Amino acid sequence: GSGHLPIFTGYVGQGLLDACAIGDVFASPSVDQMADAMREANGGAGVLRLYGNYGGDVMNFDMAGEMLEMEDVDSSTVLLADDVASASKQEREKRRGVAGMVYAFKIAGAAAEEMNNLNEVTRIAQKTADACHSVGAALTPCTVPQAGKPTFEISDDEMEMGMGIHGEPGVWRGKIKKADEIANEMIDMLLADMDLTSSSRVSVLVNSLGATPPEELYILYRIVKSRMEDVGAEIVMPLVGRYATSMEMTGVSFTFCELDSELEKLLKAPADCAFWKVG
């Protein structure tokens, strides 16, 4: 759905997405919209459907894929399920897809740009999805225009840890903490979900959920960098800014994407679109 700019339309471009289907704010696109986007993206080699793990999207994309099968268009699916707060590590298939989609779009797009076949691009996209781990924290809700009211209620002196990008409940709600405390708790959740070592190479995304300004994001990135140094892991190509938002929500999300040589090369490959930036 809309409401998350620059995801999704902002990442259509060379070395990234070929097309995207957009619904209303926080609503899945229709089956026809999805089928039209797949037709536009199809150059004869098939289409990878790459999106977050949400029921409405899954249902509609599955039906769109069936429509395209009748037109002899091959397609495959990779679901992002990177939100560590939404389900346990043992039930990863139940997790929501959040800002890890940025890495999947970039790396799978680079693989397609290299003229890999559909099976290979799908493999790389799934590998990227599996390598991504995300968590968010919010201080304010956002307002969906159709509803005309906030997606949830929260006091001015409260925050919610693990909040979803549509206002889904997090893991706890309580008094606002200092930036260092918030960041360290988020990092603890991500590190507990991963097996990083002194030889690990990780790209980190410090993402504004909408209203959080760059100055505050870089304060949080400082903490992420320090914690990675403690682990001994090396940060590769950090991303700081607005990459996947939730309307005007005040909040932040962290995504850690553990890289091997294959994923790192594709992440660093050239890309050109309105919103892709590094640093």
Where are these regions (language model features)?
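Short glycine-rich or small-residue beta-strand-to-loop segments that form or flank ligand, phosphate
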Residues: 1, 17-20, 46-55, 62-65, ...
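Glycine-rich oxoanion-binding loops at beta->alpha junctions
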Residues: 4, 11-44, 191
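Gly-rich Lys/Arg/Thr-decorated short loops/hinges at beta-loop-alpha junctions or inter-strand turns
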Residues: 8-21, 85-88, 159-175
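Short, acidic/small-residue loops that bind anionic groups at enzyme active sites
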Residues: 20-25, 69-94, 230-235
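Short Gly/Thr/Asp-enriched flexible loops that form oxyanion-binding sites at enzyme active sites
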Residues: 58-72, 91, 216-222
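Internal, active-site/partner-interface "lid" segment
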Residues: 86-95, 105-166
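Glycine-rich phosphate/diphosphate-binding loops and the adjacent beta-loop-alpha structural elements
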Residues: 149-219
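C-terminal non-catalytic interaction/assembly regions of soluble proteins
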Residues: 189-279
